[in-house]
Amino acid sequence: TDAADEDDFDSICAALERRGVQRIDYLVLSHYDKDHIGSAAALVRAYPVGQILGPDYEEDSMYLTLLKRAAEERNTPFLRLTENYTVKTENGSFTLDPPDIDYGDDNNNSLVTTVTWRETSFLLLGDAKKNRLNEFLDAALDSYELIKLPHHGDSNKPLLKLIAQTTPRYAAATVSPAEEIEDKLIAALA
């Protein structure tokens, strides 16, 4: 899920090559901020991609324009989701839950992704903020093995409620060395 910043392309390709990946079946983009789609156009040009999946809202962004152009050049379908989309595999599935409305805010327009692999479930929240998290609470599973925290680990009441409701065993956040995760979020995860 997601394609990081433009300058992360080489690292992404190196990771894919180490795993022997030669094709990307589904390129899932939680939303269209540059730190989530910066390398997406380059990935579409570098690898055969079966489908690009993202939320259905427009963003005036050079990166989204480049992605649309690359998808068109490579004849790669770009599905803009307005309802849940599930893909089943031999050992599991993933479900993409788009926002019910356009919140007018990239982060609140994030797709929420639930991945189930065998008996283990993961929740990837994009950069969802209060409105989007409140919307998702009713759809959440009873528990997740791992939650990828939204928006650099920013804490808010709906996120704390989601953690209490789903009791994840692990949580992951992408933060820079200058950022700290709030104490109340750490306490909720303990």
Regions found by a protein language model. Give the residues of each.
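Non-globular, low-confidence helical/coil segments that flank catalytic cores
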Residues: 1-190
